[in-house]
C-alpha cells in the first residue's frame, strides 16, 4: 500500500501517516452497546472505518488501468465487487473475451495478495428481445483457477443481483420490482407491532414511519425502470403495496377503497411519487465534480473539456436497423429532465481543510420571541443614531410575472439592502435576481449582496464601525449562508465567503452579527427595504432576465406537477364514474358515498380538513410533551365512516351477505344502521351530538359539514363509547377478523 502511494505521487507526509495507520492495527467490535475484547488486526483495515473505502480504491486502482487497451469489454469496480462486461457477434467470441479478461484480472489480484471467490462468481448472458431465430446462450462458462491448476464452471443465471439491483437477462425489471415490493410489504407487516386500529401509533406517526421505511424500498432504482406512460404494470405492483400502507395509516378494512383513503391521507399515488422522485434525484447531477465520468458521458452540454482532457466518451447514436432514431440511455433520459445550465456545485472553490478567516468574527442570532426581537431592533436603531452602530436590513420579494405572454406566472425575485449608520440618511441598493427562484434563494441572495456592499463600501481605507448588524426575516437563509460548503445556496454562499474574506483582510477587529428579525412596518428602514425589494421584483435588469433555475425551485415544481397529475387523474376518474352511473346504471357504492359527503375537492398540496384535525396535537404546555388530540380508535373510526367501510349495517349488507337481515338494522328501531343514521339521526346518541355541537338550535349538521367543515365536532362525537361498533346480535370476533385481514388489527 505504501509503495502504491509513493508511485501515485502522494506527499511524503500522507505516505508516512498511512504507513503508521496500517501498522499494529487493533480492533474492538461493538454490537448492541456490547464491546468485545481488543484483538490484533494483522492484515487489512476492518470494515466500517471511514478510511477503508478510500484505501481500497487506491489499492485496486492499478487493476482498472489494465483495461485501458481493451476493446468490446470493460471492468467496473465497487470496493470489493467487480463486473466484467464483454460483447461480440457470436457467443463463442463472448466466452473467449470474458475468459481472457478474467485471466488478466485474476493474475493481477493474485500478485497483489488478493483472490477471486469462485463460489461468489455469477454469470449472465444478455440477449435482445424479439430477435427471430436467435442462437441460445451457452449453458456454462469455464474459468481458470491457476492456484489449483484447474478450472471451475459457472452456470449462467437468468437474473443476478449487483449492488442491490436485480438484473434480468433481457433487461426486464419485473423481477427487481417484485422483490422490492415483497421487501416493502414484509417491512410493513413487521411494523404491525407498533399498533393497530385501537391503540398504538397515531395516524401522523404511521404515515411518517411507513414513508420512511417502506417508500424508499418501493422506489429503489426506479430511475432505471420507470418510463412515463410505459411502466403501468410495474407501477401497479408498487401501488398494491402502497394500498396496504394507506390502509394501515387510516386503520381501514381490507375492502376499503384506497383511492379516497389516499386522498384523505395525502399520500401521493405511486405513479406520481415515482415521477417526482425520478425528477428530484436527477438534480444530483448538479453536485457531481467537474471531472465526473457521468458528466463526460452526457456530452458538451454538461461537461466543459479542459486542455489535456481525453475525448468525450459520448457514443455516436446511430439509428438501429428499421428504426428512425436511437433510444437515449437511462442517464441521458434523466439528464433531459433538468436544464444543463442549472446551479452546479463547484467543490474545488474551497479546500476541505480551509477555515474561513471570518468564522470567529461573525455570529448568528436565530429565532426568538418575535415581539421581543422587534422591540430590541427598534431600540438598537434608536441607539445607533447616536453611537455610530451600523444596522443593515435585507429584504427579498418573489412576484409572479407573465414574462412570455402565455399567462403563466413565473416567479421573479428582487432583493434590497438598506444600511443605516448614525444619524445619516439610509443608503439603499436593490437588484433583480432573476426568474424561477424561491423565496429562500432570494433571501440568501440578499444576504450575499449585503456583504458585498460592505466589502466595497469599506475598501478604500474607510473605517467601519466596530459592530455591524445584518437582519433578515429568513433564519434558514442566515444559517445556510454562513456555511461556504452549503449545497442549498452554493453560489450565494461562495459570494458571501469571498466578500467577507476581502472585508476581513483589512478590518480584522470588526464584529458582524447576522440576526433574525420579523418584518416590522413601523420601522422606517425595514419598510423601505421591503418596498425596494418589491420594486426590484417588477423590473427588468439591463443585462436581461437571468433564469436562476435553483434546485429548490425545481423540486417545488416537480412536487407541484405531481399534484397536478394527481388532480387530473382524480377528475378523469370522477368523469368515468359519472358516466357509468348515468348511462350504464352501474353504482359503485363506497366511492359514491365518500365523494358525495367526505371529499368534494380534488387533491392538492393542502391537507384534507379531516386529516388535519385528526392529526392535531394538544396545546403546548411548558414542561409537557404534546400528545395527539384524539385516540387511534377515534381517528380510525372517522376514516372508516368517511368511506362507509365501518361497523355499519350498510357495510354488512354489501360484504357480509350471510348475516341475518335484522343485524343490519339499528338497535333504536327498524332503520338501516348506515353512517348517516349513526352520525345525525340515531336517538341513542342524541346527547352526544348535543355535547359535540353537532345539533345546534334544533339544526343538525350534514355529513358534508361534519367531514369537511367541522371535523373537530365529528371526532369529538366519535370519542363517545359505543358509536360505530359491531351490533350486539353479531359476533364481534367475526368483525374483528374482517379488520384483522388488513394486517393492522
Regions found by a protein language model. Name each.
Residues 502-508, 604, 613, 618-745:
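Family-specific functional microsites
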Residues 37, 53-89, 460:
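Active-site palm subdomain of RNA-directed nucleic acid polymerases
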Residues 149-225:
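Basic, alpha-helical interaction scaffolds
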Residues 20, 379-386, 548-672, 698:
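Helix/loop segments that flank and initiate small ligand/metal-binding modules
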Residues 36-37, 351, 355-460, 482:
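RNase H-like nuclease fold core
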Residues 34, 100, 115-158:
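Short, conserved micro-motifs composed of acidic
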Amino acid at each position: 500500500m505504501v509503495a502504491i502511494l509513493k508511485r501515485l505521487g502522494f506527499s511524503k507526509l500522507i505516505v508516512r501517516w498511512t504507513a503508521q495507520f496500517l501498522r499494529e492495527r487493533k480492533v474492538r467490535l461493538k454490537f448492541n452497546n456490547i464491546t468485545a475484547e481488543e484483538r490484533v488486526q494483522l492484515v487489512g483495515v476492518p470494515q466500517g472505518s471511514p478510511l477503508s473505502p478510500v484505501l481500497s480504491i487506491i489499492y485496486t486502482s492499478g487493476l482498472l488501468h489494465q483495461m485501458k487497451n481493451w476493446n468490446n469489454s470493460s471492468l467496473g469496480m465497487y470496493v470489493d465487487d467487480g463486473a466484467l462486461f464483454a460483447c461480440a457477434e457470436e457467443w463463442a467470441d463472448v466466452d473467449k473475451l470474458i475468459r481472457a479478461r478474467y485471466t488478466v484480472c485474476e493474475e493481477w489480484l493474485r500478485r497483489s495478495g488478493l483472490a477471486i471467490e469462485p463460489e461468489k462468481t455469477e454469470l449472465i448472458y444478455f440477449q435482445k428481445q424479439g430477435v427471430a431465430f436467435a442462437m441460445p446462450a451457452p449453458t456454462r462458462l469455464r474459468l481458470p483457477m491457476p492456484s489449483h491448476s484447474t478450472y471451475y464452471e459457472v452456470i449462467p443465471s437468468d437474473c443476478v443481483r449487483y449492488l442491490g439491483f436485480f438484473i434480468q437477462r433481457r433487461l426486464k425489471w419485473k423481477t427487481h420490482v417484485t422483490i422490492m415490493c415483497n421487501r416493502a410489504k414484509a417491512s410493513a407487516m413487521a411494523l404491525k407491532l407498533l399498533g393497530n386500529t385501537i391503540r398504538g401509533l397515531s395516524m401522523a406517526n404511521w404515515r411518517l414511519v411507513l414513508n420512511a421505511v417502506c417508500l424508499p424500498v418501493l422506489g429503489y432504482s426506479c430511475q432505471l425502470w420507470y418510463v412515463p406512460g410505459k411502466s403501468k404494470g410495474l407501477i401497479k405492483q408498487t401501488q398494491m403495496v402502497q394500498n396496504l400502507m394507506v390502509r394501515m395509516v387510516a386503520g381501514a378494512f381490507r375492502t376499503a377503497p384506497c383511492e379516497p383513503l389516499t386522498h384523505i391521507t395525502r399520500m401521493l399515488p405511486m405513479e406520481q411519487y415515482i415521477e417526482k422522485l425520478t425528477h428530484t434525484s436527477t438534480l444530483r447531477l448538479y453536485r457531481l465534480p467537474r471531472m465526473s465520468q457521468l458528466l463526460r458521458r452526457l456530452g458538451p452540454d454538461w461537461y466543459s473539456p479542459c486542455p489535456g482532457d481525453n475525448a468525450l466518451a459520448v457514443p455516436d447514436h446511430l439509428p438501429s436497423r428499421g428504426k428512425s432514431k436511437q433510444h437515449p440511455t437511462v442517464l441521458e433520459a434523466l439528464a433531459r429532465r433538468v436544464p444543463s445550465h442549472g446551479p452546479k456545485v463547484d467543490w474545488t472553490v474551497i479546500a476541505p481543510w480551509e477555515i474561513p478567516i471570518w468564522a470567529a468574527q461573525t455570529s448568528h442570532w436565530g429565532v426568538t420571541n418575535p415581539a421581543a426581537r422587534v422591540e430590541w431592533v427598534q431600540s438598537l436603531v434608536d441607539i445607533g443614531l447616536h453611537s455610530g452602530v451600523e444596522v443593515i436590513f435585507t429584504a427579498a420579494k418573489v412576484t409572479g410575472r407573465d414574462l412570455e405572454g402565455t399567462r403563466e406566472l413565473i416567479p421573479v425575485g428582487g432583493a434590497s439592502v438598506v444600511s443605516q449608520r448614525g444619524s445619516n440618511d439610509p443608503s439603499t441598493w436593490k437588484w433583480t435576481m432573476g426568474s424561477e427562484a424561491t423565496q429562500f434563494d432570494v433571501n440568501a441572495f440578499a444576504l450575499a449582496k449585503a456583504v458585498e456592499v460592505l466589502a466595497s463600501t469599506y475598501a478604500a481605507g474607510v473605517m467601519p464601525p466596530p459592530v455591524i448588524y445584518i437582519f433578515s426575516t429568513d433564519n434558514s437563509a442566515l444559517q445556510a449562508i454562513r456555511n461556504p460548503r452549503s449545497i442549498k445556496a452554493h453560489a450565494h454562499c461562495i459570494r458571501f465567503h469571498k466578500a467577507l474574506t476581502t472585508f476581513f483582510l483589512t478590518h480584522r477587529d470588526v464584529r458582524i452579527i447576522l440576526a433574525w428579525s420579523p418584518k416590522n412596518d413601523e420601522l422606517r428602514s425595514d419598510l423601505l427595504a421591503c418596498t425596494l425589494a418589491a420594486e426590484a421584483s417588477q423590473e427588468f435588469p439591463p443585462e436581461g432576465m437571468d433564469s436562476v433555475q435553483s434546485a429548490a425551485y425545481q423540486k417545488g415544481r416537480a412536487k407541484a406537477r405531481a399534484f397536478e397529475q394527481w388532480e387530473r387523474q382524480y377528475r378523469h376518474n370522477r368523469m368515468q364514474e359519472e358516466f357509468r352511473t348515468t348511462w350504464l346504471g352501474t353504482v359503485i357504492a363506497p366511492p359514491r358515498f365518500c365523494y358525495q359527503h367526505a371529499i368534494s375537492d380534488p387533491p392538492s398540496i393542502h391537507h384534507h380538513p379531516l386529516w388535519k384535525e385528526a392529526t392535531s396535537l394538544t396545546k403546548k404546555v411548558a414542561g409537557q410533551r404534546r400528545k395527539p388530540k384524539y385516540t387511534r380508535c377515534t381517528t380510525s373510526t372517522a376514516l372508516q365512516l368517511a368511506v362507509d367501510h365501518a361497523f355499519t349495517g350498510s357495510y354488512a349488507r354489501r360484504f357480509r351477505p350471510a348475516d341475518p337481515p335484522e343485524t343490519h338494522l339499528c338497535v333504536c328501531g327498524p332503520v338501516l344502521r348506515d353512517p348517516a343514521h349513526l352520525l345525525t339521526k340515531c336517538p341513542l346518541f342524541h346527547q352526544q351530538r348535543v355535547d359535540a355541537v353537532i345539533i345546534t338550535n334544533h339544526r343538525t349538521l350534514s355529513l358534508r359539514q361534519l367531514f369537511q367543515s367541522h371535523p373537530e365536532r365529528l371526532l369529538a362525537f366519535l370519542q363517545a363509547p359505543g358509536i360505530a361498533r359491531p351490533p350486539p346480535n353479531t359476533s364481534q370476533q367475526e368483525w374483528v377478523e374482517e379488520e384483522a385481514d388488513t394486517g393492522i388489527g
